[in-house]
Amino acid sequence: MTHDQFKKAADYWKNKKQNAMPEEKLKKTVLEYISSNNTCALATGTGDYVRCTPIEYSYHDGKFWMFSEGGEKFIGLEKNENVCLAIYDKYEGTGNLKSIQIMGKAELVEPFSDTYNKHAKIKKIPVEALKKLAPPMNLICVTPVKMEVLFSEFKKNGYSSRQTIEF
């Protein structure tokens, strides 16, 4: 493909006419979906290096929270705070698509800080148990910047199946 062809493909959804769902209704639907799941794919990267990690998450205070022992995702996190999360259902045909891509900013929470301990409590993990781990468990916090939502069911109500939320 030429550069222009890549650009045209990349801009496909930007240039497509959209029938937007009212923002509050969209946010409510998205929150319900996020809350009904607990696993995402976390994409991190820097330079030529890219990593996509399946990981459990919690969502509260408008952010995604993930405990992690470590792993190669931290190669990207060290140098690049920009991340992407994907939450999705099993593919069962184009009429049943349900997924969210979340672009956001990641930060590592200081172990045993008030924020860290608060999240441990929400996850029902005793802080004393976490203190016994060496090294301590890492806590990744992702603040959403943009969510791209693809729910086929939106079409039934006259909206485009693809919706965007900017933060």
Where are these regions (language model features)?
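Serine-centered coil/turn micro-motif
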Residues: 71-72, 113
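Short beta-strand segments
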Residues: 37-70, 85-89, 98-100
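Short Pro/Gly-enriched beta-strand edge/turn motifs at strand-loop
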Residues: 35-41, 121-124
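Charged, amphipathic alpha-helical segments
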Residues: 23-27, 70, 123-125
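Helix-adjacent hinge/juxtasegments
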Residues: 73-107
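Charged, gly/pro-rich active-site loop segments
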Residues: 1-21, 97-167
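Short beta-strand segments in beta-sandwich/barrel cores
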Residues: 40, 64, 83, 106-107, ...
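Short, basic/aromatic recognition patches
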Residues: 19-39
